[in-house]
Amino acid sequence: MKLYKIYSRAIGLLFALSLLCVGCENEDILDINDLEISPSNPESVVIVEPDDGITSVNALTKAINENGDATYILRRDGVYYMEGKNVFKHNVVIKAENGSGKMPIIQPICDAQGALNADMIRLEGSATFENIYIIGKDAATGNLMQRLFRIDESNVRLKFDNCFIDHCRNFCIRTDNVNNKIYLNNSTIRNLALTSDPANGRLIDSRGNEQDSIVINNCYVYNNTAHIVRFDNVVTNYFGIKHSTFYNVGHHIQINYAIKVEIENNIFANVGWKSSAESDVFWQISIPKKDERAQDISTLDSQLKFMIK
């Protein structure tokens, strides 16, 4: 009888182990490419109703201040006005609602005195924009914003996916701190221009702050009077331009001190038409000779020069 019980238990143990092995055999194992920075409270979804620009403005900013880290759904055909100083202090995803209709619009509007803030949105937390039309032209006067997005903190992740970004005078994205990640994906960016001072009209300006990653993928960028990216002589860990078209961009392509660069399958047309201190400058590539991270940068530099001859 005791032998029977022991035998039965042994069979049960073997069966349990076999199930455990089968259960683990086909399990998917995550790697770093599967991970994505999300709001700390991603299950929180907030629907934000549009502004009318008269009795209501800053509905999106108010919703973020009230609800914190979350996904914010904007109504299609709606406009969300930004008046005065708008600071996003939380990690947010801002996206259009599902269904038909025009993209939700985020647009600045001047105050009662006609004053327009220099920055449309300032970021202290990470932000992702999906299927949003962002226009930097004052809804009341038609005046252009100086800057659309200004990153105030370090380690911020800013991503645009399937967005349309239109109009500003100085730059679309400015960083005032280090180690940020900026991604532009499947988006159109146009009319970043100041004709009275063509040195302005930049897509991204690091303002001399080291960045982690700057990526432009499958985008259409046109009618910019200045640089696509202004690094300002600092190190960037990764800089990528892939599957994108650039047309009518005033300045040459500047790559300062990037540790890893990938430029693949792009079209550059009428780029670098603004006069330069050097003749026939299309690419400007700087090598961080004293940076210990730049082990293969000389090879990379040679490859880039070969590619663009």
Predicted regions and their residues:
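Bacterial N-terminal signal peptides that target proteins for export
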Residues: 2-11
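Structural detector of coil-to-beta-strand junctions
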Residues: 118-120, 140-141, 145-150, 171-172, ...
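Acidic Gly/Asp/Thr-rich repetitive segments characteristic of extracellular carbohydrate-active
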Residues: 34-81
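Right-handed parallel beta-helix
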Residues: 91, 125-136, 156-169, 179-195, ...
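Extracellular beta-strand-rich solenoid/capping regions of secreted or surface-exposed proteins
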Residues: 65, 80-95, 105-156, 175-176
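Acidic glycine-/aspartate-rich tracts in secreted/extracellular proteins
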Residues: 77-78, 98-101, 273
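Bacterial Sec-dependent N-terminal signal peptides
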Residues: 3, 17-47
